[in-house]
């Protein structure tokens, strides 16, 4: 099959010739201005004492392991 528009099978037919415009330099978008009408309601983050944090972590780990054990027990019961 002979293509109607030579060497342009991959591109759609150009209907009207468009005038070439000069390239405009791209402008960086400005970051939006921060409007602060009132002080933010967020409470300041108070750093926990390291020891307290560690205690919390150990408790969390213990709970996790207990939950895992219970899950396994339940799953074993199901299979029996």
UniProtKB/Swiss-Prot annotation:
One of its GO terms (cellular component) is nucleosome. Keywords: Chromosome, Developmental protein, Differentiation, DNA-binding, Nucleosome core, Nucleus, Spermatogenesis. One of its GO terms (biological process) is cell differentiation. It is found in: Nucleus; Chromosome. Residues 1-44 are annotated as: Disordered. The keyword DNA-binding applies. GO terms for molecular function: DNA binding. Residues 1-36 have a biased composition (Basic residues). It comes from the Eukaryota. Involved in nuclear basic protein transition: histones are replaced by spermatid specific proteins which are themselves replaced by protamines in late spermatids. N-terminal half is highly basic, while C-terminal part is acid. This is Spermatid-specific protein S2.
